[in-house]
């Protein structure tokens, strides 16, 4: 009986176990078998890398390559290879190839991932980060820094979380680049916080999804979300000196932006931060900077300057830190050895800031040309000239050009991208811009010799490249009707004279078969009595006995582009000038001259005065004038149709219609708040909405929508990351409510300007049809007459115009 009871109890226990664990618990246990090894996770295999000697034609092929890096001198090639799926003997490797001998050494094996390869200047040292210990799907992986030098048998571990100098909670940052100093004595890398990982046991539908905006956040939530990937990869610079086993941390949460000085050879780095000043960027558009020098030997920080509106940089040899203070409108230097701060521009007799800037804000500087060898001088621009300045502020500044006298602007064109300074006897290339004619030229200059005669031509000369072993410049030569590649000698007495240039190309030869355009500089007196400038484009076959329709296109100031080539192309947002002139239009592009607090009236003063002036010419049909603009130009178009009825049609792309609602909005492309734009930037209102509400109302087209008589075509796309899409909707719905003639073209998924060519072609057709109908009396397209209902979306675009006398099936 007892034995039967024990059997019954055993069966009962098995049944209960089966209820909880499943029926497998009732199965007869199998004999232990040797566990089969788990197959390795498949990897993304590398591809073939072919290295060819261009002189001999000899080739070498490397298989399964996932990454590679040549040294600067080409003497070393580092290759990372993957394992081959299905081949248990295949492993990932890092290979060192000496290109001269062809010798191949495997210097690193048995790892899951390796990246951020960096070679020193001589191609004899290598650093990289690698991860060896985690499974493929691990949520957290710890990378380590490895180092190899010629002569070692393999790469050695140099830095991990336990290395001296690595603070608790930090690890090697696997997302950052690694750099050697120029002399190879230091290795710069990054450490990063060990971030918490997501709890995979949490179920999405049981957890809240939200963003919390806090008034003390450095950045608004939309900006944080736009930058979240960048922030998750953020690290802090650190350095390991050759022969040392201790890491020196150079950056941290307080000074996060660190740059090398003298290519890393200096005994300090430059660290800048905006910490403590970021909230104000919401309405200022900038954050004040503080700058420090940080020792690479012990991490000690010394302040250079605090809470300055400006950007700091080190001189090439590292003797000075230089910055422009926007509020003081001066350049300052910090002498690293003495700690002295000098105002190096105080004795420059002219404005080194943009005196033509018309924003209610501190004007920006014209910038610097760079430094002379050994940090002897720093060169500072004014509007016209270049000033040689003593970085200690003891010598008087000297202008090395004479542009102001002749209304010419000189700027240095750096021919050698790797050159960090200029030498006194070095041939330099200066570009020249004629502020009167808008022509361009170049000059051959030596700092230790007087300036030569300069030449200016009705052309644009850009993109200069010097031949490495010859005194010849290759460049882009543009005129309004041609765009070609040319060469010119880079020698004394020859470079500036364009007659010495040889044109090498004949780009767009088919252009001769089309009606092109001419462009002239036009000047007129505005309503406020001041003189204005603009560009007027006429058809190549212009006939002064005929009358032409006119489209005014504008943004801010474009006259300096007088001699630039303009290519016919589908429109991203604005009218294509070659297309419209070729089709019998005159296009006028007037400069806009702004006054603080009056952006709308400034546009009226500039554009309408230009229209009145142009109307005096017999070849202008003053009843057939239109305006078109995009973004800021779109706003000005929207404002102008509330102020005047002289235009027969208008096109406004991405216009701000209501400055009161747009003021607190977000630029969704960047996550930035829009307040700074209205207070200090493009809108130029000069105050907050609550300080100057009357300016926001006066300059908002929406509040004068009842005055509009001009047919208005609006384009505003539903993925606009710059101007909120609802601004176009506010304007359109107001005009629709008032019974005005208005159209809103909205491209799905498109940003501020159109990207997809199919949409650009479509907009080009609609712009042409819209203006042809209103200015030339052409038959209107169906979309103009009756729109396109949602039921016909993707079936009928409404752009097909049937010829007169024919009916569609």
Predicted regions and their residues:
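Glycine-rich His-Gly loop
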Residues: 274, 433, 478, 553-557, ...
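Beta-propeller folds
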Residues: 1-475, 481, 493, 781, ...
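Active/binding-pocket-proximal capping segment
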Residues: 336-352, 393-407, 447-449, 491-499, ...
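Hydrophobic/aromatic beta-strand patches that form the interior of the parallel beta-sheet core
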Residues: 51, 96, 238, 248, ...
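Blade-level signature of beta-propeller repeat domains, shared across WD40, Kelch, NHL, RCC1
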Residues: 478-480, 485-488
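Secondary-structure transition/capping motifs at alpha-helix termini
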Residues: 135, 150-152, 294-300, 317-319, ...
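Cap/lid segment of the alpha/beta-hydrolase catalytic domain
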Residues: 347-359, 498, 505-624, 628-630
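Active-site-proximal cap/loop segments of hydrolase catalytic domains
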Residues: 566-809
